[in-house]
Amino acid sequence: MSGTTETQLRDLLSSMHLRHRFLGVFDKSFPGFLDPHVPASAIVNTGSRASGGMHWIGFAFDPAAGRCYMFDPFGWSDQKLWELYRVKYNAFMRRTGLRQPDRCFTLVRSTEAVQCPCSAACGLFSALFIVSFDRYRSKPMDGNPVIDTVVGVKHENMNSPPYRDILHRNQERTYYWWTKNSAYFRAHQEELRRETALNALPENHV
């Protein structure tokens, strides 16, 4: 098995005692952020629950700022997400917008990769973003001590050895961060490291 399960991600984030409303872990049928008054977040898979899932992405909504954040550890565009996973998030974005007093919000999304394609750690990176949103709601995508654990790499550089090394270091730093900050991760780190390991998906190295 490669990657983190729904249960593992829920338990990992439960160990962080989040102060905002973490809605949970969902497959691609996530309904959206339907309460226009409450800061909330979720981890959403690009696949269906029946398929076993494919790739985890972190989402968060800050109603005070009128912003929805989308943290994809690969930073893929909508077009690339469709090419790779046959998934679109238009429906839940639309439902979120319709619940807002003025029926609009700003989408802020990651555009660079922090994860190597050979890795199965998308869930751990997405969970790191959820903690970043919890602690630094005004700047969850960069510029705070949680999310700056990782460094973004432009897509055209992802398979260049020096930049691949950066992505590999991101994963090691993320393991270290979770070890330091989560009792759940410490108790289950052998299993979590094994299931999310670098080179778990070596065929994705080109």
Curated annotation (Swiss-Prot):
Site annotation (Cleavage): which residues?
52-53
What is known about regulation of its activity? Answer: Requires DNA and protease cofactor for maximal activation. Inside nascent virions, becomes partially activated by binding to the viral DNA, allowing it to cleave the cofactor that binds to the protease and fully activates it. Actin, like the viral protease cofactor, seems to act as a cofactor in the cleavage of cytokeratin 18 and of actin itself.
Which keywords fit this entry according to its UniProt record? Autocatalytic cleavage, Disulfide bond, DNA-binding, Host nucleus, Hydrolase, Late protein, Protease, Thiol protease, Virion
Q: Which reaction does it catalyse?
A: Cleaves proteins of the adenovirus and its host cell at two consensus sites: -Yaa-Xaa-Gly-Gly-|-Xaa- and -Yaa-Xaa-Gly-Xaa-|-Gly- (in which Yaa is Met, Ile or Leu, and Xaa is any amino acid)
What InterPro entries does UniProt report for this protein, alphabetically?
Papain-like_cys_pep_sf, Peptidase_C5
Q: Which GO terms describe its molecular function?
A: cysteine-type endopeptidase activity; DNA binding
Q: Name one GO biological process term.
A: proteolysis
Keyword Hydrolase listed? The answer is: yes
Q: Where in the cell is it found?
A: Virion; Host nucleus
Is Protease one of the keywords? yes
Induction context? Expressed in the late phase of the viral replicative cycle.
**Which Gene3D superfamilies does the UniProt entry name for this protein?**
Adenoviral Proteinase, Chain A
The cellular component terms of Gene Ontology attached to this UniProt record, alphabetical and capped at eight, are: host cell nucleus; virion component
Cite the active-site annotation: 55, 72, 122
EC main group: hydrolase
Q: What is its EC number?
A: 3.4.22.39
Additional detail: All late proteins expressed from the major late promoter are produced by alternative splicing and alternative polyadenylation of the same gene giving rise to non-overlapping ORFs. A leader sequence is present in the N-terminus of all these mRNAs and is recognized by the viral shutoff protein to provide expression although conventional translation via ribosome scanning from the cap has been shut off in the host cell.
Which family does the record claim for this protein?
Belongs to the peptidase C5 family.
Role? Cleaves viral precursor proteins (pTP, pIIIa, pVI, pVII, pVIII, and pX) inside newly assembled particles giving rise to mature virions. Protease complexed to its cofactor slides along the viral DNA to specifically locate and cleave the viral precursors. Mature virions have a weakened organization compared to the unmature virions, thereby facilitating subsequent uncoating. Without maturation, the particle lacks infectivity and is unable to uncoat. Late in adenovirus infection, in the cytoplasm, may participate in the cytoskeleton destruction. Cleaves host cell cytoskeletal keratins K7 and K18.
Its subunit composition reads: Interacts with protease cofactor pVI-C; this interaction is necessary for protease activation.
Which HAMAP family does this UniProt record tie to the protein?
ADV_PRO (MF_04059)
- This one is known as Protease
Corresponding gene? L3
